[in-house]
Amino acid sequence: MKVSKLWLREWVNFSLTEQELAEQLTMAGLEVDAVNPVAGQFTHVIVAEVLNTKPHPDADKLTLCEVNINKDKPLKIVCGAANVRPGLRVALAMIGAHLPGGLQIKESKLRGELSQGMLCSATELGLAEHSEGIMELSDEAPIGMDLREYLALDDHVFDIDLTPNRADCFSILGVAREVAVLNKLPLIEQPIVTVAPAIDDGLRVNLIHSEACPRYCGRIIRNLNLEAKTPLWMAERLRRGGIRTLHPVVDVMNYVMLELGQPMHAFDLAKINGEINVRYSASGEQLELLDGQEVVLNDNVLVIADKEKPLAMAGIMGGANSAVQELTQHVFLESAYFNPVTIAGVARKYGLFSDSSQRFERGVDPCLQSKALERATELILSISGGEPGPVIESFDKKFLPGTVSFLFDTTKVKKLTGLSIPLNEMKNLLEGLGVVITKETNHFFEVTIPSHRVDLQQDADLVEEIIRLYGYDKLQAQPMQTSVQAGLISAKEKIATHVSSWFSAKGYHETISYSFVDPELQEALYPQKEFMELLNPISSELSQMRAGMWPGLIASMIYNSHRQQTAVKFFEIGVVFDLDGGQLKERSCIAGLLMGEQGNLNWSESARLFDFYDLKGDLQSLFASLKLNDVEFIQSSHHALHPGQSAQIVINGKHSGWIGVLHPRLSDAFDLDQDVVLFELNLESLINPTIPLYKPISKYPQIRRDLSFLVDRQISAMQIERVIRNTVKEDWLKSFDVFDVYMGKGIPEDKKSIAVAMTLQDDTRTLVDAEINLTISAIIKKLENEFSILLRE
């Protein structure tokens, strides 16, 4: 929000310097980012009048001018601007003047003709970044008057960075309220004239979706003066507020928005068919906006429409077809209250930003609409003339914000801030904000909140207001006077710490990504899930809560792979959000991925790419470190994973996660030329409820037996291992490893050869060959019965 100091002083008569005011506002929560002069440094520039002109005899693009400066005789000026003409009042830099950039004006000859000064453009005076021709001043500008005095250029603009809760300060009036209460000064109310209608014309307004727009005010003004121009004083105030001038009616709309905080819009009445309908758009409706962009609307965009078509995106931007043009003679003015939830996020979704949307999505005063409309009418009539109709107001009281009243416990100021502030001081501060105290009982105030402070809803909000107005600098540092008891670390926190350290030691890099994700990416990875949509997203690419950890990891991986990272090893621990039947449930997860080359360049071995088994091996090592023995990798299909390289992870009989290679369809979509291997696990599934017990290492010898089987291709090593573990008695099987898998020549097409190594050992004695042979025979028989496996010699 850009605020002119001189404009602000019309509302509250303070005597602070620019630096003092900036510090005061910043300490009160309205952070001032910059304080800038409204014009460049220049001297001896006055208002002058061009009396007559004639072409330069030796230069086609130069003009000889006689200029009146209210002295005995006119000055001779050579000018190169195309818009110089007799009768024009201009900005004249006199001989000896200093202009921005260090230019000093001297008497000189241009192509042989005397020039006793310089007619200036707005750019040359530091009043605009771009301008065409010299400045054209009002016909009423006093000849000979210093330009700085005439345009009130000894002014500064405060650039205020407002927090989202302070929508009330998006206006001169709002900031003036703050300055008044901070300095205990009265607010100079600017009277708003109620304009009597001169004609009976009006438009019917239908609030079809009144929950989104519970109040809509409008007014017709006919027979505008097409020759009218925006007065210089208004154009200057708009410039200082960061808004360029367009058309007298549009400029008034923007002026009232800066002054009072109510965004408004003007329609060309001739382009409206019959009536105004405030409704949601139909999916597929199109609208060309004021900036020339054509948008295709979905079914949740609030629009202002007539009988047949949308005219504007409500609260965001008007349509080009119904915009006020140079030849517009009849207008319809709009001043409405839109529900902030309806506007929030829509502008960002369509890549739009406007001063209106910025204000509406934070919340405007729901009682301001008719006042702003009267103020705009008054200004338009004074500039462009015209015949106003009556104010048309449609509202639905059911959806208008009600008056906020509650019982404020003043003792909470001490409890929450540690400051003892007298009750009278609290009362004065609150009343300075416009809060009405209807009753005082002991330490309680019955308060009614003013309609413009939509952010004040409870005790804590009033405590914040009191302390910021009283002064944060009065908060004294005090030692904590309480007993502090160390908290307990939960099992989930312990496992998260262990797993994070374990993966870091394995060479993985931990990532931390937003819980907000790109809807397109998430729907591609989890098409079977429901997703939680954000009402007010940071951007359209971050508009859903994540239902899994993979979107963030994949986005980080793509970012790094595009920056010549040849090996990517990432993991992330975080919370995911499951939407189940409208209920939101949070789940702690860990996920990771591998992509690229395994290991560093090494003369003794060639590099290879990460594969499924690298990640599976890391997970098996993790499970071993956590003493999780009942873990299975069961081949299964997942929409985001390769059909032949994906598996469910089952821990203690419960589905706990997934592992696999990213589906080729997705790899192609992400323009990846290498496999990406991913996993995701519920963090709680890694918590081992059993307490580890000491067990001595066996001093008896281990015995290894190798077996080679011919099996059907669809049978997994996990299935074979499960049968073997169930067959071997007691705790003899210490390890089970697959050391060879072969499919090809000499093997039937529907078969494969698997060779496994088993390590057998007893903790209390030495195993003898006879009992080992019986065990091996039992294993072979069981496998033959279960899977028709054939033992290979």
UniProtKB/Swiss-Prot annotation:
Cofactor, how bound (note): Binds 2 magnesium ions per tetramer.
Question: What is the originating organism of this protein?
Answer: Legionella pneumophila (strain Paris)
GO CC annotations, alphabetized: phenylalanine-tRNA ligase complex
Q: How does it assemble?
A: Tetramer of two alpha and two beta subunits.
Q: Where in the cell is it found?
A: Cytoplasm
This one is known as: Phenylalanine--tRNA ligase beta subunit
Which residue intervals define the domain FDX-ACB in the entry?
698-792
- Every tRNA-binding domain range: 39-148
Q: Does the keyword RNA-binding apply?
A: yes
